[in-house]
Swiss-Prot record:
It comes from the Bacteria. Heme c binds at residues 46, 49-50, 86. The lineage of its organism: Bacteria, Pseudomonadati, Pseudomonadota, Gammaproteobacteria, Methylococcales. It comes from Methylococcus capsulatus (strain ATCC 33009 / NCIMB 11132 / Bath). GO terms for molecular function: electron transfer activity; heme binding; metal ion binding. This is Cytochrome c-555. Transmembrane segments: none annotated. It holds the Pfam family Cytochrome_CBB3.
């Protein structure tokens, strides 16, 4: 038996197994913008009206549907200026400064590329 060959094969197998263990299990990798948007969505209370998943309820629009129709500018307009029972957020620094990230997060939810619920902080 060629001992050298076997040991190389064993090393390769070990690397494969270790690699599989090191990879995060089933976590959706998101970029920094999406993660920031998610934090703003939660912390600035969008979720109290539009729901933790963004899907709204009888009284509040489903933002996953809304973002299939609203342009980014229309999104910014309604969030910053408000509309009817939607409060204006332009005086909220976190929202006003993070509006692009907020859009990225909700757009990702709408497109189905960002899962509902907690997101892992990007490395
Ligand atoms: C107090 C409850 C409340 C909060 C908090 C709230 N919204 Fe709204 N939002 C509403 C209501 C009600 C509407 C529907 C307004 C209307 O009828 O014109 C709405 C509408 C919207 C729309 C437009 C939807 C469409 O289809 O045109 C967007 C986008 C939106 N909200 C995003 C947000 C974001 C982002 C936040 C957090 C920064 C937020 N909302 C916080 C109640 C809320």
């Amino acid at each position: 038996m060629d001992h050298k060959k076997t040991s190389i094969r064993t090393t390769a197998l070990a690397a494969l197994v270790l690699g599989a263990v090191a990879a995060p299990a089933f976590s959706a990798p998101v970029d920094q913008a999406t993660y920031n948007g998610f934090k703003i969505y939660k912390q600035q209370r969008c979720e109290t009206c539009h729901g933790a998943t963004g899907e709204g309820s009888a009284a509040f629009p489903n933002l996953l549907n809304s973002l299939k129709n609203l342009s980014k500018d229309q999104f910014k307009e309604v969030v910053l200026k408000g509309r009817n029972a939607m409060p204006p957020f332009e005086a909220n620094k976190k929202v006003a400064e993070g509006i692009d990230d907020l859009y990225t997060y909700i757009k990702g939810r709408s497109d189905g590329t960002v899962p509902a619920g907690e997101l892992e902080k990007p490395q």
